[in-house]
């Protein structure tokens, strides 16, 4: 399903990205570990990312 969460560190790019849990229920982009998800929305103003799980 689709989910929107806050992100920490750098904003993920739209497309496939490796994401992992971060602090306070947010996610972050990682190069190793995590899982690959399809990112379809990035809102840098709100600090949120929407992706398909």
Predicted regions and their residues:
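Surface-exposed, low-hydrophobicity beta-strand/loop segments enriched in small/polar/acidic residues
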Residues: 1-53
């Amino acid at each position: 399903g689709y989910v929107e969460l806050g992100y920490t560190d750098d904003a993920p790019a739209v497309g496939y990205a490796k994401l992992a849990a971060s602090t306070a229920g947010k996610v972050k982009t990682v190069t190793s570990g995590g899982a690959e998800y399809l990112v379809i929305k990035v809102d840098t103003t709100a600090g949120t990312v929407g992706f398909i799980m």
